[in-house]
Amino acid sequence: SVGFKAGVKDYRLTYYTPEYETKDTDILAAFRVTPQPGVPPEEAGAAVAAESSTGTWTTVWTDGLTSLDRYKGRCYHIEPVAGEENQFIAYVAYPLDLFEEGSVTNMFTSIVGNVFGFKALRALRLEDLRIPPAYSKTFQGPPHGIQVERDKLNKYGRPLLGCTIKPKLGLSAKNYGRAVYECLRGGLDFTKDDENVNSQPFMRWRDRFLFCAEAIYKAQAETGEIKGHYLNATAGTCEEMIKRAVFARELGVPIVMHDYLTGGFTANTSLAHYCRDNGLLLHIHRAMHAVIDRQKNHGIHFRVLAKALRMSGGDHIHSGTVVGKLEGEREITLGFVDLLRDDFIEKDRSRGIYFTQDWVSLPGVLPVASGGIHVWHMPALTEIFGDDSVLQFG
């Protein structure tokens, strides 16, 4: 007769629903779950669904004031991971209503915000997300995309070439600009600020921007080609970041750069909107990604961070090189490279793609192969990445 009974209860009673048929509007997630010894996989999967949606550790009377059935995440399928002991892929469906429109920040806060510290789990990794068109349509996405960038630069049918200016720290702005000019004059399309170059005592950002702009215009005049330098606008505050982007626009240069993980998705999305409104291309560096994506059984796979960036906005993103790594790695990398570039990507577990993804004409992002590559890698790089890529040397 008691209408309400408190106490700890199993999550799987409410959140494990193997008979659930996913909706076209659901956000689907694939988690690699390693339960603690003695915790059944259904309970672990349901715990993930609960804690990343409407659940808390007990029943509360306010649950009766809403429709949990409408708002709860559901673990709808669990499968063991081949070759791994006590690891499972748990598939979770989230109703679209749980997420704020146009906010990657809110999406991640909900899906991966709390659940990774969960006691019932030894480890947890978000392997993939299916973003439904109903949600992706609430995002601007990349400021320009691959085709518009090629049209702006008048460069077709080949990868774009770039290099990072070294030594990355310690040069004066004048000498930095000299190096930029030599590289661009020598035939590169782009040069790049290193991700650590922001505005340090030995080279303040405004001086660097001026000397780099001078180098760009000189090289353009002498070669008759359009040149660019990724001016790093990353800063300690969003206001300062936008200030730097405004100055780049005033100089008339074609592209700025941002570290999207250290800078954060909120700042990145603001910058992407500014770039579209003002005709700037946006180059994205992924500093800090390995902190999140390197462990095989815990964290977030980079393909999820790549999808999130396509939604938040960027025209280029660093995506690894593949060169000299294992074959399997190559397939996985090509999987998320296609997720960045293509309109429609079929589910293909051999490439790590857990869901079919339809981007419905959201602009594509150019993958940037960067990090320890040199001229002898060229044949492999062009074969792996094809024409729609940026090969970033140095």
From Swiss-Prot:
Binds 1 Mg(2+) ion per subunit. Pfam families: RuBisCO_large, RuBisCO_large_N. It comes from the Eukaryota. Substrate binds at N114, T164, K168, R286, H318, S370. The active site is at K166 (proton acceptor), H285 (proton acceptor). Gene3D superfamilies: Ribulose bisphosphate carboxylase, large subunit, C-terminal domain, RuBisCO large subunit, N-terminal domain. The record marks K325 as: Transition state stabilizer. It is found in: Plastid, Chloroplast. Mg(2+) binds at K192, D194, E195. The disulfide bond which can form in the large chain dimeric partners within the hexadecamer appears to be associated with oxidative stress and protein turnover. GO terms for cellular component: chloroplast. The modification N6,N6,N6-trimethyllysine is found at K5. It catalyses: 2 (2R)-3-phosphoglycerate + 2 H(+) = D-ribulose 1,5-bisphosphate + CO2 + H2O; D-ribulose 1,5-bisphosphate + O2 = 2-phosphoglycolate + (2R)-3-phosphoglycerate + 2 H(+). Keywords: Calvin cycle, Carbon dioxide fixation, Chloroplast, Disulfide bond, Lyase, Magnesium, Metal-binding, Methylation, Monooxygenase, Oxidoreductase, Photorespiration, Photosynthesis, Plastid. GO terms for biological process: photorespiration; reductive pentose-phosphate cycle. The basic functional RuBisCO is composed of a large chain homodimer in a 'head-to-tail' conformation. In form I RuBisCO this homodimer is arranged in a barrel-like tetramer with the small subunits forming a tetrameric 'cap' on each end of the 'barrel'. PANTHER family: RIBULOSE BISPHOSPHATE CARBOXYLASE (PTHR42704), RIBULOSE BISPHOSPHATE CARBOXYLASE LARGE CHAIN (PTHR42704:SF16). Heterohexadecamer of 8 large chains and 8 small chains; disulfide-linked. The disulfide link is formed within the large subunit homodimers. RuBisCO catalyzes two reactions: the carboxylation of D-ribulose 1,5-bisphosphate, the primary event in carbon dioxide fixation, as well as the oxidative fragmentation of the pentose substrate in the photorespiration process. Both reactions occur simultaneously and in competition at the same active site. NCBIfam families: PRK04208.1 (NF003252). This is Ribulose bisphosphate carboxylase large chain. It comes from Nelumbo lutea.
